[in-house]
Amino acid sequence: MTQQAAEVAKRRTFAIISHPDAGKTTITEKLLLMGKAISIAGTVKSRKSDRHATSDWMEMEKQRGISITTSVMQFPYREHMINLLDTPGHEDFSEDTYRTLTAVDSALMVLDGGKGVEPRTIALMDVCRLRDTPIVSFINKLDRDIRDPIELLDEIEAVLKIKAAPITWPIGCYRDFKGVYHLADDYIIVYTAGHGHERTETKIIEKLDSDEARAHLGDEYERFVEQLELVQGACHEFNQQEFIDGQLTPVFFGTALGNFGVDHVLDAVVNWAPKPLARVANERTVEPAEEKFSGFVFKIQANMDPKHRDRIAFMRICSGRYDKGMKMRHVRLGKDVRIGDALTFFSSEREQLEEAYAGDIIGLHNHGTIQIGDTFTEGEALGFTGIPHFAPELFRRVRLKDPLKSKQLRQGLQQLAEEGATQVFFPQRSNDIILGAVGVLQFDVVASRLKEEYKVECAYEPITVWSARWIDCADKKKLEEFENKAVENLAVDGGGHLTYLAPTRVNLALMEERWPDVKFRATREHH
């Protein structure tokens, strides 16, 4: 095996998906603890930056105390290199969250044991399904009252349409939480709470049918054995291929706060989740072990340092290796650039990167030339697919406070749209500018950034738009007919694509019925 193939085989790149407050932040910290990378990485840190600024580097994040931006953390674990991509978990997140899922090979779903499957989890799972991403599940908060575990598994299967295979099974919960039983390997992992940054030594009881197990479970023993028989009869067994195909999820139980069960999940990612996978480009399929470098940009983050109008483009490496100072071709622009200062997202010690391999995420300094979906290679003209725009769910009309600044407004919105902070639509029948977003917070982010970076003050007005759909139609004549009939609701997005702004769900359904030759798409590839 070449050194490069060996490095790729060591990589595991995954994201955590959850509803807000299911415990994602806590589990992220505990995962870093497992990797001993406890210089808790938020985003790229400079040595001088204080801890507070680590992750919440935008003013607004500081005020609200939430992390809007998706950060990347790399840490070693069991001779592997883990790349963990965090996704904003706040009530309001953005398209960034969705797009981050295009850059990973697997995902960890965290559920609150007291609440089960929640709306945000469903939305994120839908995105994972676009690429059949393998999912590992962690049912959290066993140190509190939780719902019946069998009920939780049924809910995962019914709502998320994925088979659930329990790997561990909880023994009690809340004050009676005694640990978990490993179904396949027949041993008990005893619960001892390890708070903060301690890693507690794991105590194991071999075999459920033992005096030690009977003593540990006490009066609960008989009932637990009965419950297990029921579970083993009713639940799916783990199947590696079904997991890789995104059809089955292994389920673990624990408490991130009590630092229990998190290592089981990380072991599952290392043992079962795929190493960096081949990626499909328009021209061909790119294998990770290929010698030549290639990668795509899935996210752009602004102002990591408020003093500079600097933006960092996050790139997933798909093949080859990055070496400091190497020359890359920026395919969309057809230009060669030398990259000497890519950033890595390791602990604070290593901020300038010397080398990186397929599966790793690197940060490129971007002075306005890089867009989401851009491909970088060692010369070959490739364009990776599968980095979509998602139809916004919320819309506002922009009102400018100073009409003389309309040029700055358009310029600012154009850049923020390229970055993925918002989507912008220009209706064909008016001079309005309409913004679309996935979470309300995106509108606040745009307003504050327009003010800080472009000195433009704007306000928002409500507008009757239910959803947006990108229009495709192979038949030119039909398309023309459609455009004439639907002109009141047609707009062009920031990339110049024809978009239908549906005022209501019913209206959209009627239009789709009336115009069978016209495709109304809910996602659009970056080109």
Swiss-Prot record:
List of residues binding GTP: 18-25, 86-90, 140-143
InterPro entries, alphabetized: EF-G-like_DII, EFG_III/V, G_TR_CS, P-loop_NTPase, PrfC, RF3_C, RF3_dom_3_sf, RF3_GTP-bd
Chief location: cytoplasm
One of the protein's GO biological processes: regulation of translational termination
Compartment list: Cytoplasm
GO cellular component terms attached to this protein's record: cytosol
Nucleus listed as a keyword: no
Keywords from the named record: Cytoplasm, GTP-binding, Nucleotide-binding, Protein biosynthesis
Molecular function terms, GO-annotated: GTP binding; GTPase activity; guanosine tetraphosphate binding; translation release factor activity, codon nonspecific; translation release factor activity, codon specific
Top-level taxon of the source organism: Bacteria
Domain tr-type G: residue ranges: 9-277
Family as reported in the entry's similarity comment: Belongs to the TRAFAC class translation factor GTPase superfamily. Classic translation factor GTPase family. PrfC subfamily.
PANTHER family in the cross-refs: PEPTIDE CHAIN RELEASE FACTOR RF3
Function according to Swiss-Prot or TrEMBL: Increases the formation of ribosomal termination complexes and stimulates activities of RF-1 and RF-2. It binds guanine nucleotides and has strong preference for UGA stop codons. It may interact directly with the ribosome. The stimulation of RF-1 and RF-2 is significantly reduced by GTP and GDP, but not by GMP.
Protein name: Peptide chain release factor 3
Organism: Pseudomonas savastanoi pv. phaseolicola (strain 1448A / Race 6)
Taxonomic lineage from the root: Bacteria, Pseudomonadati, Pseudomonadota, Gammaproteobacteria, Pseudomonadales
